[in-house]
């Protein structure tokens, strides 16, 4: 290197986002179905009691200890109906309990779905990758409007503007519905990395006014690839964006057999590393 190239006069700068967000997908939501044998093994509790007395208490402890904020993405029900014949959720006690605690902790309520069926049109063939159903456009509109109504009924006078696609799957047709029919939604938080039917994004303000903000890493199985992705995103945009599902503890592919104690420890290790590595990173909601 020449002395000219190495001169301290040559300093470059560029704008960064400077924000850290932790998403809770499927939260608040009804108690999910799934194999709770590892929850039973480790805690001798059913799934509902485990979420209330263990998982949520632990997640809130990270708020108290590290100052992070959660954006919860609501699922109204886990039914498979995509006909557009929507109905309101009658059992709201868990939504109110968890949602209000989330808000009081400095968090935010967002939208995930009327159910957990991605907004994909009838013309889409999942080719066996997913067993999800598909929608007519009018049914998508009905379902999303019901979700907005439901959230507003439970959490009035609270801004709710973030949409998280179920399984990070969102079609062009579904996105069009969000933009044209659901004015409450101002931003979509999906995935930075491409995958089967994934709605992958860059950080940007789209020409139609929607804010695109991808999530970078997920869960409590934070392998070398995820750690590299997290480090790279801090370098590029000075951003952390992580999401986790409560039902990771029920899904072997997401670490259920390891047990919540291990997943929790991995997550806390990441949060602690983040705080020590980037102490000036702002704790934000989506």
What are these regions (language model features)?
Residues 56-57, 90-100, 194-201, 219-231:
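Alpha-helical scaffolding within the catalytic cores
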